[in-house]
Amino acid sequence: MTFDVKILGCNSASFAFGRHHTAQLVNNNQNLFLIDCGEATQIQMMRHQVRHSRIDHIFISHLHGDHYLGLMGLVFTFHLQGRSEDLHIYGPAGLNDIITIQLQHSESRLNYTIHFHLIEENDQLLFENEDIQVYTVQMNHRIPCYGFVFEEKQRKH
């Protein structure tokens, strides 16, 4: 069973040469989950040879730019690469509006469907499959902010 985390970026809001805004990639049995999507996330994905098509779930912790401003670029890259599978985006109130408004104003129609999942509470179960469960943990920040707990399920022998 594979379960690991790759740090694509961990820099603060200010840009620094050689450091990138927040993004982490969780690999669970070759299923990739992206946590946050700061600017340059796609560059880091290319550097680490991460195929975009393997990401079906994106979790955004909060709406400070260093955690989500790379998301629209990634959404459009998925489209340009011919993605047809649904994409699930989990985030706080307002994220759906941000993405929807950008799609409307650019008169863009995606090849795939985005499903928005609103994070509303602490200890909320966001995702579950046969291997893992993903829960929220409320963080102490100036605006609503959530951490994500990826918990492996017990294997039956």
Predicted regions and their residues:
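Binuclear metal-dependent hydrolase catalytic cores
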Residues: 1-157
